[in-house]
Design a protein with these regions (language model features):
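Metal-dependent nucleic-acid phosphoesterase active-site entry motif
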Residues: 1-27, 167-199, 245-249, 253-254
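Extended charged low-complexity segments that act as oligomerization/scaffolding linkers
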Residues: 1-7, 28-115, 316, 322-330
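Conserved glycosyltransferase catalytic-site signature
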Residues: 11, 15, 48-52, 272-279
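Long, positively charged, glycine-interspersed low-complexity recognition regions
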Residues: 23-33, 40-41, 68-70, 75-78, ...
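Non-catalytic, alpha-helical, charged scaffold/linker segments
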Residues: 77-222
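Long, positively charged binding patches that form subdomain-scale interaction surfaces
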Residues: 192-277
Length: 330
């Protein structure tokens, strides 16, 4: 059977398509996607990030009161995505990264196998309206966690800002490489501690009233669950010290986009964290990847589209038209 093409859709694309006028540009895109999905030519797996963002969107109207109609609208958008996802969903970032790492350690490279990146999961069909009323509360707590995740990158940005002058292109390239490299430190330190202790203690990050696992510890725990022993841990330390994340697609994408923001003096926001995780999860395996224009430009600056042979699209009119043409030819 011929391999299906993969289209990664972000929240903005879904919200623009779900009730678009059929003759509009977004309506045409929706129509061609539904056609190709039903013909089993195209697959549009749902990312976990879609669920995070759906739950996190405030259900309060302009007057500050609960808006049932707005809640229904968000639920309808989720239902539309569920219909085209056909029960397929992307794995989370740490799961994908752990799988890529183990393949690299055992086989010497990371092959783009679809089952490594997405699978059948119940949350693609979840009735979102039942739990949406408390979603905005989750989002507030999640923002505390996101602040922990990107505080180091924002610190790097401030250090570079204090260093003074605007970097030339060669200097930016060197700075990008450097910032990607230093993001390996926490993982190398964690692996060395794993080798010493023989186990992983998953620390919690306090996020308002809830406690969320530390991302480094969580990845190491998943690696141990996938039978990472001391020999493989030492091999991974050597890999990270020598090549950084270069051979691990999800981690390479994530660290590159984090570094790009720091080099260009941009402060990360909770939405940036979600968007970067979206790219880390879906960019490598997708044939077509939808992102906001800023992230599209960042992906292209880092040449990640070329490295992983993925076509990037944004909500700009000419970009949407180009995607419609591309999908029509499948």
């Amino acid at each position: 059977m011929k391999r299906k093409k993969i289209l990664y859709l972000d929240q903005f694309a879904v919200s623009n398509m779900y009730n678009a006028v059929p003759t509009s540009l977004w309506g045409q895109l929706r129509s061609i996607i539904i056609e190709k999905v039903n013909n089993r030519i195209l697959s549009c797996p749902m990312p976990l990030e879609h669920l995070y963002e759906t739950l996190g969107r405030s259900n309060m109207g302009e007057d500050g009161n609960e808006s049932i109609e707005y809640s229904k609208q968000i639920a309808q958008q989720h239902h539309f995505f569920s219909e085209i996802a056909k029960g397929t969903t992307f794995y989370g970032y740490e799961e994908i990264a752990a799988t890529e790492i183990m393949m690299l350690l055992r086989q010497g490279n990371v092959k783009p196998i679809q089952s490594m990146y997405f699978h059948k999961a119940y949350y693609a069909d979840i009735e979102i309206l039942d739990i949406y009323a408390n979603g905005h509360k989750f989002n507030k707590e999640n923002h505390f966690y996101n602040q922990e995740l990107f505080k180091d990158v924002n610190g790097l940005r401030e250090d570079m800002k204090k260093a003074g002058q605007e970097l030339s292109k060669p200097d930016k390239s060197l700075a990008l490489d450097y910032l990607c490299k230093i993001q390996t430190r926490a993982y190398i330190e964690g692996l060395k501690e794993l080798c010493r202790k023989g186990e992983v203690n998953v620390r919690g990050v306090q996020c308002g009233k809830i406690n969320i696992p530390n991302k480094v510890d969580l990845l190491l725990k998943l690696l141990c669950d996938k039978k990472l022993d001391k020999r493989l841990a030492q091999k991974l330390i050597c890999e990270l010290e020598t090549h950084g994340f270069e051979k691990i697609p999800s981690m390479n994408i994530r660290s590159s986009l984090n570094a790009d923001m720091a080099v260009n003096g941009k402060s990360q926001t909770p939405n940036d964290v979600i968007d970067i995780d979206r790219a880390a999860i879906g960019l490598r395996i997708s044939d077509y990847f939808f992102a906001d224009n800023e992230k599209k430009l960042a992906i292209e600056r880092c040449q990640l589209d070329k490295k992983y042979q993925t076509k990037i699209y944004s909500a700009k009119k000419d970009s949407v038209s180009s995607l419609i043409t591309e999908l029509s030819e499948l």
